[in-house]
């Protein structure tokens, strides 16, 4: 996953072909009856989604999930890049319930609406633009896409 410091270490990230090889491996082990699953990461496209997981992935950041960082900042998920627009408040100065009900708009709007590539994708209604933790907030596009590579 190209998030956090991994963004600076391109040579260590799996290539698209290596990621597909890993997903093919997981699919094969599941077909053999091994209880292996691909974790919470991003939508894998209809080719892989139900083959390597028990159900379709949808990023729940800011919808069902909130996180409080060590400094008190309130965000949607600890894996999401810390930026002014992703920090929704601070537990030491803000009421959590009010933050939850009145903020988090950035996470309650489909990422697909922000990206032309995603908006035009046939799988957009399933993917919703992917995960917030792998979203490029400057370029307004997903860093990882299995739908429309």
Regions found by a protein language model. Give the residues of each.
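Radical SAM enzyme [4Fe-4S]-AdoMet core and its adjacent flexible, acidic
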Residues: 1-75, 79-88
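Flexible mid-to-C-terminal extensions adjoining Fe-S/redox cofactors in radical SAM and related proteins
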Residues: 79-149
